[in-house]
């Protein structure tokens, strides 16, 4: 099968911890043909969805890429959106372009309207029975109150990824104010 992965720039991915590369490696081991693309390589020509992609192959130490070519998205067995946050206008427009490609027969995994309207960090709110008590807020006073109640908490942004801006806070932490300003953007 032929799969195209819409990714962040490959040079920014950390091969030892990036889940997109892990998924791709497993797909490669199973004999699938892999291609990579980025958000700005999705487009409409007239009303026709198109994608610029490069054939991707793992090597012992790294990977190789073939020349970028233009394809009809429906020519792939699957398009897999794996772009990390931020959820900005480019991301939003990419989901619209992927919806258009799907309406023309492309098999798009990670449903474009679902990833547009569903924040993965908020998914815990649907299954609270499987999570510790949590608080979702940008209000510093509420976070301090939660910290006083639990004495040891983890705070992280809803739009982060890769462990960025995740902090463990304890009551005696000397940087509580700075951490809360950082995490809430002075909320």
Language model segments and positions:
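Active-site nucleotide/adenylate-binding loops and adjacent lid/helix of ATP-dependent enzymes
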Residues: 3-29, 34-83, 88-187
């Amino acid at each position: 099968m032929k799969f195209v992965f819409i990714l962040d720039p490959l040079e920014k991915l950390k091969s030892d911890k990036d889940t997109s590369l892990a998924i791709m490696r497993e797909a490669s081991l199973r004999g699938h043909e892999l291609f990579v693309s980025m958000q700005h390589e999705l487009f409409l020509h007239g009303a026709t969805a198109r994608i610029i992609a490069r054939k991707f192959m793992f090597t012992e130490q790294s990977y190789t890429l073939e020349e970028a070519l233009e394809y009809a998205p429906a020519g792939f067995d699957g398009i897999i959106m794996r772009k990390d946050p931020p959820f900005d206008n480019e991301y939003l427009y990419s989901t619209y372009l992927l919806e258009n490609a799907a309406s023309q027969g492309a098999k798009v995994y990670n449903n474009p309207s679902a990833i547009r309207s569903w924040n993965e960090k908020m998914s815990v709110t649907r299954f609270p029975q499987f999570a510790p008590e949590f608080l979702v807020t940008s209000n510093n006073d509420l976070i301090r109150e939660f910290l006083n109640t639990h004495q040891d908490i983890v705070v992280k942004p809803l739009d982060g990824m890769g462990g960025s801006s995740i902090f463990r806070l304890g009551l005696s932490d000397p940087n509580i104010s700075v951490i809360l300003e950082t995490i809430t953007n002075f909320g």
